[in-house]
């Protein structure tokens, strides 16, 4: 299985709708069966969408086998107006699960759809008529197609009651004679072999056939394929045809904007600003055969990085102008054909679910036709099919366009019976050789001169400028016959006669085919009136119930809504966890609570910043003053420290001086004491010699003088010798 690279995700597998089991069990005509929850692919879709928006070049794709869901079997009774009632049963798909809530209205609407004679004998009403033997899902599909074709509306739960009323109104205003437009549409189907009843040929050998052919040629309001939603079928099919030819801008851009945008993100496009081919990042999908040569179908260089990837390279600088994922039709078409018959999902369904624009080669188209597996390959409402992958190749050769258009009209089983010769003509192998020779003539004109054909505005007429000599793709003998019929001058008179005769025949047939006895006609009229009255009352009851439920829901949510409004506009900075619990207690929705708490957090941060700024502004002056004072004090402290150091030096000098003086003083004092002691000794001697009393002599104090004790005692006689 190849990996996709950048497919746009616009159409994804429909998620299974959840249903209330208890309400379904109480619905009449439903047998209860076990319910299995469905697989939700929303996460995969979100992943792919984000990756594509970010320009991712490698998005892994995984095939998911969605398990079958056991749904309830529903039985409905359809009561046509002109025949007996019959029942249909089956399961309702998840996409139409809302119909389970309005089964009575569905039965009434199916009664009208099962009675095509109520709508002017319209061919559209006959084509989508509900018939006995249908399954419930087929009947619902027929009903949806009927509403889309007749009312140009899409069936939804919201407008279902309006659709039923419109069907009733349309049926009540009908007449028994069908309009000329419906006749012409029916006859055109027979003329071109597209009628489901088998191949028929319009006889134009007489005047009546010529008149019918002229009417068919003059009519332009015939739609063979219904549109999607409210898109007009002609606009829808014209858009598909333009995409098939690589002319997306020729389609109505009010309906095909997304597909056109994806187209120019995938296929080679000329960038007028850079004057070169754009470097495409998004990858496309090619359905091709294993034996065909893709390089012969493009003017660019073809590079294959691996078996599943193809790059188209610019011939000037080899940059990538387009990227494609190659899928072989032999690998997916047979499995898709078998899955369609078994009601399962195929690999091709998963491929188509991840892209809006797909390329398929002419060889792949011929392969699916040859092997009888072409149904559902190109006729997909969610995918726009482009024949070929190089726009210039398709526009210049038209190879495969007619075959693809034919496969879009009908299933292969119908084409094999009604358009066998056309298929044989389109399947001829000589067409590929002719296309190859025509494309070689394109390449001979030079690469640079062909760049203008890839301009997004598509200003030039593509192949019309390149191939004025190219012959027509087919020869239509019917067109010649219709042109010849214009020369008939009696056509208006014959046409009027034919119309009158047909009206008479239809009136006679309607009288002869009426199986109802005349005695039962009044009762049948009363029954129809009562049925219409019952339908009207049921619709009024449904509207009343819906209105009542809406009023109750509004009353219950009024208080909560008012509280939500108050909380959203209330300014608060309380972001505590307990506050979230209180909001949950008053039943505020989780998303609203989250929004409120985030808003409060932002307000709180804003106020914190504001308060911080104001406080900082007020404190800045004080801080500056304190800083200045601190600097002044620091200078004073420095000066005091210097003064203290000077004082300490002076003190040390003074201490040294004092110490020196003390030492000098002590020495001098000792010398004086010693002298006095010597004098005392001499006085003692003289006193003795003079016989003076010794007590009258004063002695020198020796104890008060340090070092006096060590002095020589002169009182002791010394030996002078």
UniProtKB/Swiss-Prot annotation:
<keyword id="KW-0694">RNA-binding</keyword>
<feature type="region of interest" description="RNA-binding">
    <location>
        <begin position="1"/>
        <end position="38"/>
    </location>
</feature>
<feature type="site" description="Important for the formation of viral factories">
    <location>
        <position position="572"/>
    </location>
</feature>
<dbReference type="GO" id="GO:0003723">
    <property type="term" value="F:RNA binding"/>
</dbReference>
<keyword id="KW-1035">Host cytoplasm</keyword>
<protein>
    <recommendedName>
        <fullName>Protein mu-NS</fullName>
    </recommendedName>
</protein>
<comment type="subunit">
    <text>Interacts with mu-2. Interacts with sigma-NS; in viral factories. Interacts with the inner capsid proteins lambda-1 and sigma-2, and outer capsid protein lambda-2; in viral factories.</text>
</comment>
<feature type="region of interest" description="Interaction with mu-2">
    <location>
        <begin position="14"/>
        <end position="40"/>
    </location>
</feature>
<dbReference type="GO" id="GO:0039714">
    <property type="term" value="C:cytoplasmic viral factory"/>
</dbReference>
<feature type="coiled-coil region">
    <location>
        <begin position="628"/>
        <end position="686"/>
    </location>
</feature>
<feature type="site" description="Important for the formation of viral factories">
    <location>
        <position position="570"/>
    </location>
</feature>
<feature type="region of interest" description="Interaction with sigma-NS">
    <location>
        <begin position="1"/>
        <end position="13"/>
    </location>
</feature>
<keyword id="KW-0175">Coiled coil</keyword>
<feature type="region of interest" description="Involved in the formation of factory-like inclusions">
    <location>
        <begin position="471"/>
        <end position="721"/>
    </location>
</feature>
<feature type="coiled-coil region">
    <location>
        <begin position="523"/>
        <end position="560"/>
    </location>
</feature>
<comment type="function">
    <text>Non-structural protein implicated with protein sigma-NS in forming the matrix of viral factories, which are large inclusions in the host cytoplasm where replication intermediates are assembled and viral RNA replication takes place. Together with mu-2, recruits the other core proteins to these factories.</text>
</comment>
<comment type="similarity">
    <text>Belongs to the orthoreovirus mu-NS protein family.</text>
</comment>
């Amino acid at each position: 299985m190849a990996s996709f690279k950048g497919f746009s995700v616009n159409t994804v597998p429909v998620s299974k709708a959840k249903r209330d089991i208890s309400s379904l069990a109480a619905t009449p005509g439903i047998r209860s069966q076990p319910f299995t929850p469905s697989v939700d692919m929303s996460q995969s879709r979100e992943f792919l969408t984000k990756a594509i928006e970010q320009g991712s070049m490698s998005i892994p794709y995984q095939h998911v086998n969605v398990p079958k869901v056991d749904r309830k079997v529903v039985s409905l009774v359809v009561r046509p107006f002109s025949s007996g009632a019959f029942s249909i049963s089956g399961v309702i798909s998840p996409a139409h699960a809302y119909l389970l809530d309005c089964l009575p209205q569905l039965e009434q609407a199916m009664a009208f759809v099962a009675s095509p004679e109520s709508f002017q004998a319209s061919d559209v009403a006959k084509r989508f008529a509900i018939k006995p033997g249908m399954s419930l899902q087929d009947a619902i599909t027929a009903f949806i197609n009927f509403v889309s074709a007749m009312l140009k509306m899409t069936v939804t739960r919201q407008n279902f009651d309006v659709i039923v009323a419109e069907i009733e109104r349309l049926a009540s205003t009908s007449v028994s004679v069908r309009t000329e437009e419906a006749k012409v549409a029916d006859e055109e189907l027979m003329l071109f072999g597209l009628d489901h009843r088998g191949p028929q040929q319009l006889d134009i050998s007489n005047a009546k056939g010529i008149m019918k052919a002229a009417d068919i040629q003059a009519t332009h309001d015939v739609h063979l394929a219904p549109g999607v939603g409210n898109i007009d079928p002609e606009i829808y099919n014209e858009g598909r045809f333009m995409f098939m030819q690589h002319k997306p801008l020729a389609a109505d851009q009010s309906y095909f904007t997304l597909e056109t945008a994806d187209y120019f993100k995938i296929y080679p496009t000329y960038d007028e600003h850079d004057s070169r081919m754009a470097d495409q990042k998004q990858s496309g999908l090619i359905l091709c055969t294993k034996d065909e040569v893709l390089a012969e179908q493009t003017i660019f260089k073809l590079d294959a990085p691996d078996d599943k990837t193809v790059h188209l390279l610019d011939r000037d600088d080899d940059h990538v102008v387009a990227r494609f994922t190659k899928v072989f039709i032999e690998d997916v078409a047979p499995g898709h054909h078998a899955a369609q018959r078994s009601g399962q999902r195929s690999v091709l369904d998963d491929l188509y679910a991840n892209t809006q624009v797909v390329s398929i080669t002419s060889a792949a188209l011929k392969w699916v036709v040859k092997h009888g597996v072409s149904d559902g390959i190109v006729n997909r409402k969610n995918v726009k099919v482009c024949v070929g992958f190089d726009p210039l190749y398709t526009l210049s050769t038209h190879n495969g366009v007619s075959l693809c258009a034919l496969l879009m009209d009908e299933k292969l089983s119908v084409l094999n019976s009604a358009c066998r010769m056309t298929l044989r003509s389109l399947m001829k192998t000589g067409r590929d050789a002719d296309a190859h020779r025509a494309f070689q003539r394109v390449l001979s004109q030079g690469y640079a001169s062909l760049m203008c054909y890839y301009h997004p505005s598509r200003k030039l007429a593509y192949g019309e400028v390149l191939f004025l000599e190219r012959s027509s793709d087919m020869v239509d003998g019917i067109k010649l016959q219709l042109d010849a019929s214009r020369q008939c001058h009696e056509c208006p008179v014959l046409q009027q006669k034919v119309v009158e005769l047909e009206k008479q025949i239809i009136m006679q047939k309607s009288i002869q085919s009426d199986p109802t006895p005349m005695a039962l006609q009044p009762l049948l009229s009363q029954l129809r009136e009562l049925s219409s009255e019952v339908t009207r009352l049921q619709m009024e009851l449904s509207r009343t119930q819906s209105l009542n439920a809406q009023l109750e829901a509004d009353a219950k949510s009024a208080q909560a809504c008012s509280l939500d409004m108050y909380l959203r506009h209330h300014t608060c900075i309380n972001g505590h966890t307990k506050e979230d619990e209180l909001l949950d207690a008053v039943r505020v929705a989780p998303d609203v609570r989250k929004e409120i708490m985030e808003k409060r957090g932002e307000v709180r941060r804003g106020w914190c910043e504001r308060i911080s700024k104001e406080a900082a502004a007020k404190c800045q002056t004080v801080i500056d003053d304190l800083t200045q004072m601190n600097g002044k004090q620091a200078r004073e402290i420095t000066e005091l420290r210097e003064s203290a150091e000077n004082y300490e030096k002076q003190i040390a000098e003074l201490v040294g001086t004092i110490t020196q003086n003390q030492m000098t003083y002590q020495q001098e004092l000792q010398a004086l004491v010693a002298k006095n002691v010597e004098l005392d000794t001499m006085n003692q001697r003289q006193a003795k010699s003079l016989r003076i009393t010794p007590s009258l002599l004063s002695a020198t104090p020796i104890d008060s003088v340090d070092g006096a004790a060590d002095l020589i005692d002169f009182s002791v006689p010394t030996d002078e010798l």
